């Protein structure tokens, strides 16, 4: 980095409009959600379609709606901000009556408000970098674990040294959908890494981009992270004594001291869950104490369906960030170190109506669907798993072959 770039970073201010409109637009969404949350779709938990026009108008630069039935991805800035709402840990999903709602984690929100503006800015950058999976916005997951910002960085370095002019190459817009992805490009604008020029007379797109230019801030800041981006596989920022993420940039930005560190929506409450477990046309309803391990839950499911337990298994669910996690049998490898012997049912981010999978016997590939029907807070120390309702004959675990 040059001395001028270092000084530029040191002098950078953080407010509603600098280095981009990220903090203003993100705060607008938090205020809109309030204490009651907002309705989201049942499948991918995205903003309800009926809310999109209103949310779009709340943005600093709203897009002109050209589509008859716009979706969340039709508004790249909203799509990117939704990703940050989930990846930051500031929100979580609940089922309220028949509606699925996105709620604010009040504990995390208190921590958020205790941060200064530079700390809020870099907390969101951290969330994008480490947890910004496309899966959160209902797309096919891509990118690298622990560096979801790579697509944006690669695009910035390869295509924006002299800027990108789409005036005479409108077909190039389609390539932006794939790299860096329109939501990532919108986030780059919100973070102030790029400036984007629009001209609706030259483009029929909902987001009529005609020119993308890197900013001084984008050039300088991304140089601070260049080593971490290029060699992220060799960095372990969670190891005690390891160099913290963003250490070079924070050395220049003296107001950046703390980060958002969400701890979850609440402490685990002692009680009993009712799960409806289905396999084919058969189902069993199980009453399960929250304090038992996932190994014990697995055993209860297999017993309820008259399956033996001579095979490996895993539980598959979406965490509070909206990213799929696998909790594996202790004999399996798990890159995140999540094992069924170490985790209790009550430690999962369960809510009424939530669905998750018990994947058993990877050869025959049995997949049991679990639905959380209810939870009752109670002393579960003397409770044991039990079947409270059953219907249908389960499939045979082992087929008999005639020779």
Regions found by a protein language model. Give the residues of each.
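Short, amphipathic alpha-helical interface elements at domain boundaries
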Residues: 1-80, 96, 107-112
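Extended intrinsically disordered, low-complexity coil regions enriched in Ser, Thr, Gly, Ala
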Residues: 49-53, 92, 163-168, 178, ...
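Short acidic, hydrophobic short linear motifs in intrinsically disordered regions
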Residues: 37-69, 141-176
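Accessory beta->alpha helical hairpin/"wing" motif in late/C-terminal subdomains of nucleic-acid enzymes
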Residues: 81, 92-143, 195-244
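Short, solvent-exposed secondary-structure capping/transition elements
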Residues: 42, 78, 87-101, 310, ...
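Short amphipathic alpha-helical interaction segments
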Residues: 71-87, 173-195
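Hydrophobic residues on short alpha-helical segments
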Residues: 23, 27-30, 146-157, 185
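Short linear regulatory motifs enriched in tryptophan with gly/pro/ser
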Residues: 2-18, 179-196, 201-403
């Amino acid at each position: 980095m040059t001395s001028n770039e270092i000084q530029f970073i040191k002098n950078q201010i953080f407010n509603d409009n600098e280095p981009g409109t990220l903090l203003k637009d993100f705060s607008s969404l938090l205020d809109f959600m309030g204490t009651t949350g907002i309705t989201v779709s049942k499948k991918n938990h995205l903003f309800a379609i009926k809310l999109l026009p209103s949310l779009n108008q709340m943005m600093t630069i709203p897009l002109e709606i050209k589509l008859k039935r716009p979706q969340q991805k039709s508004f790249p800035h909203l799509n990117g901000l939704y990703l940050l709402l989930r990846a930051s840990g500031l929100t979580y999903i609940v089922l309220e009556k028949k509606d699925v709602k996105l709620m604010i984690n009040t504990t995390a929100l208190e921590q958020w408000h205790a941060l200064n503006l530079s700390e809020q800015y870099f907390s969101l950058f951290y969330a994008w970098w480490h947890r910004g999976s496309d899966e959160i916005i209902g797309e096919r997951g891509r990118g690298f674990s622990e560096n979801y910002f790579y697509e944006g960085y690669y695009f910035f370095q390869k295509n924006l040294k002299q800027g990108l002019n789409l005036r005479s190459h409108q077909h190039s817009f389609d390539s932006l959908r794939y790299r860096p992805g329109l939501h990532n490009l919108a986030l780059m604008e919100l973070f102030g890494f790029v400036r984007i020029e629009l001209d609706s007379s030259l483009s029929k797109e909902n987001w009529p981009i005609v020119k993308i230019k890197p900013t001084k801030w984008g050039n300088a800041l991304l140089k601070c992270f260049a080593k971490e981006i290029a060699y992220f596989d060799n960095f372990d920022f969670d190891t005690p004594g390891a160099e913290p993420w963003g250490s070079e940039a924070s050395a220049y930005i003296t107001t950046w001291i703390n980060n958002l560190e969400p701890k979850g929506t609440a402490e685990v409450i002692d009680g009993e869950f009712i799960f409806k477990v289905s396999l084919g046309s058969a189902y069993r309803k199980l009453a399960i104490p929250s304090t038992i391990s996932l190994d014990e839950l697995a055993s209860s499911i297999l017993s309820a369906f008259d399956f033996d337990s001579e095979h490996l298994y895993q539980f598959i669910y979406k965490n509070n960030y909206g990213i799929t996690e696998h909790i594996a049998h202790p004999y399996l490898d798990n890159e995140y170190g999540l094992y069924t012997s170490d985790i209790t049912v009550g430690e999962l981010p369960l809510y009424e109506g939530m669905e998750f999978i018990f994947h058993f016997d990877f050869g025959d590939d049995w997949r049991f669907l679990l639905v959380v029907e209810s939870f009752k807070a109670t002393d579960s120390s003397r409770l044991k798993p039990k079947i409270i309702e059953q219907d249908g004959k389960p499939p045979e675990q082992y087929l008999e072959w005639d020779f």
